[in-house]
Amino acid sequence: MEAKIYYERHLPHWQPLGKVLFITWRLAGSLPAGFWRECTEKSAGKRFVAFDRTLDSGRTGPMWMKNADVAKLVSDALRYGETERGLYRMLAFVVMSNHVHLLIEAVKPLEKITRLLKGYTARCANQYLARTGQAFWQDESFDRWVRNSAELERIIHYIENNPVKAGLVNHAEDWAWSSAAKSKAETILQVR
């Protein structure tokens, strides 16, 4: 089966293989009803800012990944997708209380990556939380094709500093479920 480079459901998706993609997954029910209708007049960039601010505010919907075990499960699955499954090369990620930001160079089609990771983490998290028959993740993702190195650096900074911006930690590397924490650990190991 050939991977689709472009398709639309509720949101447009550009997903060329071998390109860097900025992806956001959110928990089901994490945005207030009518959120997208209120954003129809905004540009794509302004829609994303409103989307991310609403998620970071933590005022709507479930916050399953506030639970350290669930956040670790998702974080470990993201790393496993890179190191063991070879689905992508991960450049940055963060697991927040109700959403995940991920920056990858896709080796496999994004549809496959999303299906495998969201499916696995949903099953495991729902089992851990003693939930059955309920959606864990929203069925669609926000994704953006990163087009140049300046945008790449800006997005890495944005992702890794999301917990700081949300007021959860003072320093990005203090958030355990992010690539910033991994970078700090690797630096410490190299110094030793």
Model regions: which residues?
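Short catalytic/metal-binding and nucleic-acid-binding patches
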Residues: M1-R192
